[in-house]
């Protein structure tokens, strides 16, 4: 990256500390030294570098040669000169622009957003897995036999108040996160260890299931023979391969859908060629070549580059500020560094000659030289381009008495559209230019500007100034706005053609020359000369300023071609600070070396923009789908804020905790209006149609609960032993949990319970399992009764399933004493689907082979012409001043 090394910054700080120390020392020696001869003594043409050691040597030599009085005088003179020189050096150092410190973390987050297809699929998507469960005898003892059932692979319900609907919403979210863009079965296939002829099955989980079934003593011989025959079937002429898989019917439906709706598309050279931004393809400064012909099996996933459907620039100040900040940091990392700048020392010396500072006694013109250094110039160049690329608002820092800064500011306001500056800063700068340079030149009274005036100072001045050239320049600045142009479907903010070709600088120079010829009738002659000399310094570099303007425009437009999201211009909450002394540095130190972005930098910038934009759209699609699902699951109010928070977290760059609530809810409202993407909708429908099967396979979700005032005996069950479970609801009066929750009318159920009538609440609800006999004796099941009778709530209902068998603690209490345990509740739970090998064996079909390429620009080799020969849009060299 193009940032200065940290070591260099430390060295600068050390030097600064040394100079401060030296300044303090010299002040202690002589506090009352006169400062009237600053311009004479400090900026003499002869350069001296004085260190502490040299100072001591010089002083000791002079003392030896002279008597005591002379030595005292000489010591004072040397110290005075030394102090003045150090003071000016320190002032210059203080006025330099500090090196821009990149927020490395934001840049890394942006660059780490990779396209999803980079995650290689190694297994099929599964919700279910077959599990071997024991069988229990009538007395609760475990048999040696086992039976296979389909159970949930991830059977997790978080603790606390939790609704089964939320489980399904989380399951849907999990499916969306894992939903593959493509499936290539050949890549995930593994060897079937039990195969006779080294056949393969579709994935490692299928192989593990086959192994477990093959080794199970109760497996039929026919099934073992079938497993030994399981292998892939290849149809090479059709580029198709079939793999055997063991899947639950619902999982088979999911994977079948993924295979049918893959997002991969054929890839060829034309697609790669058209993927490169058109303006870079057509830019004569870049030489692009395709390295190779692609095979017929090459595939790619088209990035999702829909324009911003949420309009984040509209009423989302915090979010917009974060996006523009991250774009600004990214843009700064790709703006090229200026090369071969004019030597700072040589330029300051030349400027001091032009100003004839040694002949002057006024102090104002020494300020012209403060803050001029190459680091500030480079920093200013990068700030201007990066701020325009990211549409970050800038604020200006300046000192009104530094006329050189204000004259440089006139160039800045000429080439950068007014919208880029925060209004308060723009008004302050324009007012300073009017009252310091323009109005005094014509002998006009100071402008008294009213805060809140809809017109800017330049707009007021344009109407009052009679001079044609000055009024013409003011008119240009007042109407200098970005042109909004849609290129390749992206809204671009384009600069005025007069700025792009640099002609506007001539217009500025005409206005400046007119100002320098005026008499400044109300001002002293020294004031007039100072302004004239400042204008002279800038006008001496007319050619370089034209080149600088063209260079700025070219780099901005070339990098702008790599932006994929609409460039919306809205003032940002925070601003990027720009000091006018750094603009002076840029104007005074710009050389004649052309710098243009390298092709690798452009491709990197383009890829990062595409990846962020594509990820942004995919996350929007996910959030819209989750909101729709939450609505259909009646969780709309409960889950909404967390859905929006998850959406922002997955965009990587946001600090979600700091986003104001009003913007969260506005974001929710905008997401709610968007249509659901068809693939995501189909996936939700698959889950919604099979909710009962998923509930049955869970060890934590029941289909209802039976409540009685009197104890009910625990029953024997093959799957659990002694258990308070009901497999059907025959003979019980049923109340729907959904309706009870909706109506809030608990009178019916309370009356039934108090009249000793058992009642069945039907609906999916979570339950917990307890296998301790002691806990069954120790407590009544208040978890249900209290919720119903006292709290009048069913949304936090969580019954306990008591499971007593030979695996339980203290089982001997039941076995030895023929005790019949009882409970006041029964959990209504249907039997999970039994695993049937024949019904679970599916053949899945996919392409035999294809290769997905995620980085299309890797096939393009690119180079540039010699920078000195680089041309702008008008087919003339960018930098003409050689």
Curated annotation (Swiss-Prot):
Site positions for Interaction with the intermediate capsid protein VP6: 222, 226, 230, 841, 843
PTM info: Sumoylated with SUMO1 and SUMO2. Sumoylation of viral proteins seems to have a positive role on viral replication.
Region entry 5-fold hub, spans: 1-82
GO molecular function terms attached to this record: RNA binding
Biased composition (Basic and acidic residues): 9-27
Keywords: Capsid protein, Inner capsid protein, Repeat, RNA-binding, T=2 icosahedral capsid protein, Ubl conjugation, Virion
UniProt-annotated stretches for the region Hydrophobic: 396-416, 424-444
Broad class of the protein's primary localization: virion
Cellular localisation: Virion
Biased composition (Polar residues): 28-39
Cellular component, GO annotation: T=2 icosahedral viral capsid; viral inner capsid; viral nucleocapsid
Region of interest (Disordered), ranges: 1-45
Entries under Pfam families matching the protein: Rota_VP2
InterPro entries: Rotavirus_VP2
HAMAP family: Rota_VP2 (MF_04123), Rota_VP2_A (MF_04127)
Function: Inner capsid protein that self-assembles to form an icosahedral capsid with a T=2 symmetry, which consists of 120 copies of VP2, with channels at each of its five-fold vertices. This capsid constitutes the innermost concentric layer of the viral mature particle. It encapsidates the polymerase VP1, the capping enzyme VP3 and the genomic dsRNA, thereby defining the core.
Subunit details: Homodecamer; each decamer is made up of two conformers of VP2, called VP2A and VP2B. Interacts with a VP1-VP3 complex. Interacts with the intermediate capsid protein VP6. Interacts with NSP5. Interacts (via N-terminus) with NSP2.
Free-text comment on this protein's domains from its UniProt entry: The N-terminus binds RNA. It is necessary for encapsidation of VP1 and VP3. The N-termini of 10 VP2 molecules form a cylindrical hub underneath each 5-fold axis of the inner capsid.
Family label: Belongs to the rotavirus VP2 family.
Name this polypeptide is given: Inner capsid protein VP2
Organism in which the protein naturally occurs: Rotavirus A (strain RVA/SA11-Ramig/G3P[X])
């Amino acid at each position: 990256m193009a940032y200065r090394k940290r070591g260099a910054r430390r060295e600068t700080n050390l030097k600064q500390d040394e100079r401060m120390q030296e300044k303090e020392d010299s002040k202690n020696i002589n506090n009352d030294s006169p400062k009237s001869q600053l311009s004479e003594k400090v900026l003499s043409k002869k350069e001296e570098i004085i260190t502490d050691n040299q100072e001591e040597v010089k002083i000791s030599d002079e003392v030896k040669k002279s008597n005591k009085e002379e030595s005292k005088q000489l010591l004072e003179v040397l110290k005075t000169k030394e102090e003045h020189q150090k003071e000016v050096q320190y002032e210059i150092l203080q006025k330099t622009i500090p090196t821009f410190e990149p927020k490395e973390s934001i840049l890394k987050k942006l660059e780490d957003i990779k396209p999803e297809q980079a995650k290689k699929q190694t297994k099929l998507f599964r919700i279910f897995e077959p599990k071997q469960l024991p069988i229990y005898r009538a007395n609760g003892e475990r048999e040696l036999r086992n039976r296979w059932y389909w159970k949930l692979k991830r059977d997790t319900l978080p603790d606390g108040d939790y609704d089964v609907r939320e489980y399904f919403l989380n399951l849907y979210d999990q499916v969306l996160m894992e939903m593959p863009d493509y499936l290539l079965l050949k890549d995930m296939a593994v060897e079937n260890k039990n195969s006779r002829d080294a056949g393969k099955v579709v994935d490692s989980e299928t192989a593990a299931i086959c192994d477990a079934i093959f080794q199970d003593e109760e497996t039929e011989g026919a099934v073992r023979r079938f497993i030994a025959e399981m292998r892939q079937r290849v149809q090479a002429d059709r580029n198709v391969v079939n793999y055997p898989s063991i899947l639950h019917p619902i999982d088979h439906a999911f994977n079948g859908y993924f295979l049918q709706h893959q997002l991969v598309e054929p890839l060829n050279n034309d697609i790669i060629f058209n993927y490169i931004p058109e303006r870079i393809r057509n830019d004569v400064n870049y030489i692009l070549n395709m390295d190779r012909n692609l095979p017929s099996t090459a595939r790619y996933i088209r990035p999702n580059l829909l324009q911003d459907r949420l309009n984040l620039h509209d009423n989302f100040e915090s979010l917009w500020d974060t996006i523009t900040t991250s774009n600004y940091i990214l843009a700064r990392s790709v703006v090229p560094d200026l090369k071969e700048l004019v030597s700072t020392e040589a330029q300051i010396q030349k400027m001091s000659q032009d100003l004839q500072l040694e002949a002057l006694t006024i102090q104002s013109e020494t300020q012209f030289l403060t803050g001029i250094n190459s680091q500030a110039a480079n920093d200013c160049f990068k700030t201007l381009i990066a701020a325009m690329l990211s549409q970050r608002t800038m604020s200006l820092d300046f000192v009104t008495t530094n006329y050189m800064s204000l004259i440089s500011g006139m160039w800045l306001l000429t080439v950068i559209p007014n919208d880029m500056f925060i209004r308060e800063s723009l008004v302050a700068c324009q007012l300073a230019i009017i009252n310091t340079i323009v109005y005094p030149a014509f002998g006009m009274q100071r402008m008294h500007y009213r805060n809140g005036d809809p017109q800017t100072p330049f707009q007021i001045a344009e109407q009052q100034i009679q001079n044609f050239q000055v009024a013409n320049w003011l008119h240009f600045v007042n109407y200098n706005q970005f042109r909004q142009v849609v290129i390749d479907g992206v809204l671009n903010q384009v600069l005025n053609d007069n700025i792009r070709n640099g002609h506007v600088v001539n217009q500025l120079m005409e206005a400046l020359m007119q100002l320098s010829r005026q008499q400044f009738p109300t001002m002293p002659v020294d004031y007039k000369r100072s302004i004239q000399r400042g204008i002279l310094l800038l006008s001496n570099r007319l050619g370089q300023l034209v080149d600088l303007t063209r260079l700025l425009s070219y780099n901005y437009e070339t990098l702008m071609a790599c932006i994929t999201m609409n460039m919306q211009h809205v003032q940002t909450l925070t601003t990027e600070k720009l000091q006018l002394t750094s603009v002076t540095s840029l104007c005074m130190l710009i050389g004649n070396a052309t710098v243009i972005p390298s092709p690798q930098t452009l491709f990197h910038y383009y890829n990062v923009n595409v990846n962020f934009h594509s990820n942004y759209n995919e996350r929007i699609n996910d959030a819209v789908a989750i909101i729709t699902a939450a609505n259909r699951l009646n969780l709309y109010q409960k889950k909404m804020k967390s859905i929006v928070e998850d959406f922002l977290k997955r965009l990587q760059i946001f600090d979600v905790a700091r986003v104001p609530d009003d913007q969260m809810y506005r974001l929710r409202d905008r997401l709610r209006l968007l249509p659901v993407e068809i693939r995501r909708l189909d996936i939700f429908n698959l889950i919604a149609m099979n909710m009962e099967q998923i509930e049955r396979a869970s060890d934590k979700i029941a289909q209802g609960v039976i409540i009685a005032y009197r104890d009910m005996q625990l029953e024997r069950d093959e799957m659990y032993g002694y258990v308070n479970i009901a497999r059907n609801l025959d003979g019980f009066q049923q109340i729907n949990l959904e309706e009870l929750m909706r109506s809030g009318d608990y009178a019916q159920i309370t009356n039934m319970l108090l009249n000793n009538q058992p009642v069945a609440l039907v609906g999916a609800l979570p339950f917990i399992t307890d296998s301790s006999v002691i806990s069954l004796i120790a407590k009544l099941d208040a978890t249900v009764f209290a919720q119903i009778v006292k709290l009048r709530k069913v949304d936090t209902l969580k019954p306990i399933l008591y499971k007593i068998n030979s695996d339980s603690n203290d089982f001997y209490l039941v076995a030895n004493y023929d005790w019949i345990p009882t409970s006041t509740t029964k959990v209504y739970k249907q039997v999970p689907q039994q695993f049937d090998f024949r019904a679970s064996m599916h053949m899945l079909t996919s392409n035999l082979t294809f290769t997905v390429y995620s980085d299309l620009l890797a096939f393009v080799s690119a180079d540039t012409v010699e920078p000195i020969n680089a041309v702008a849009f008008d087919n003339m060299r960018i930098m003409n001043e050689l």
